[in-house]
Amino acid sequence: MKLSFHGQSTIYFEANGKKVIVDPFITGNELSDLNAEDVEVDYIVLTHGHGDHFGDTVEIAKKNNATVVGLAEVADYLSTSQGVENVHPMNIGGKWEFEFGSVKYVQAFHSSSLTNEDGIPVYLGASTGLILEVDGKTIYHCGDTGLFSDMKLIADRHPVDICFVPIGDNFTMGIEDASYAINEFIQPKISVPIHYDTFPYIEQNPEDFKKLVNKGEVQILKPGEEVKFD
């Protein structure tokens, strides 16, 4: 499996001959190394509806005839309002086996909406994290979230190999809460900090996060770099 980070909360992986992107915020993201027009994927998986996660979903889905996996409200919005033909609705607690591996939606503490063409926020259900089981690895993408103790329950049920954890503060956990989550609750083999430096509100030094983490390895990735694992 190839697993790479592409700025903000975007990750990309290839498994079982399928290409998957999570939270494809590319256009308007100065830290992204991707061009939305060039992205070729079979699946798009979304944690929630905010623009810095929903991003280029519609364009990429239509261009590739890709299946978009998201909460029921997100899937309904895409199919009824945006003309996306292939959607797979899910909800928190649910798991589904796809061609590339499985997706399970877990809770996150955050909000979820998208501003439409008229400037009106559209409610898009809950915000979530993801448990991805791919090629024998368990990946926990925390999405956008504050600190909560049931992260331990999630990790107890699904021992985590690789965790993508937000550290930006202001909108999500900051460095202290994120490192606490890793050390006390999730305890993954590898932690990758995400959701920082994209905007002035979330400027952080990931090395400060790395210094506080004492469980597992921390890999600080530049956009386009791959996670290194056995």
Swiss-Prot record:
Keywords: Hydrolase. Pfam families: Lactamase_B_2. It comes from the Bacteria. Signal peptide: none annotated. GO terms for molecular function: hydrolase activity. The keyword Hydrolase applies. PANTHER family: UPF0173 METAL-DEPENDENT HYDROLASE MJ1163, UPF0173 METAL-DEPENDENT HYDROLASE MJ1163-RELATED. NCBIfam families: PRK00685.1. Belongs to the UPF0173 family. This is UPF0173 metal-dependent hydrolase Sca_1312. It comes from Staphylococcus carnosus (strain TM300).
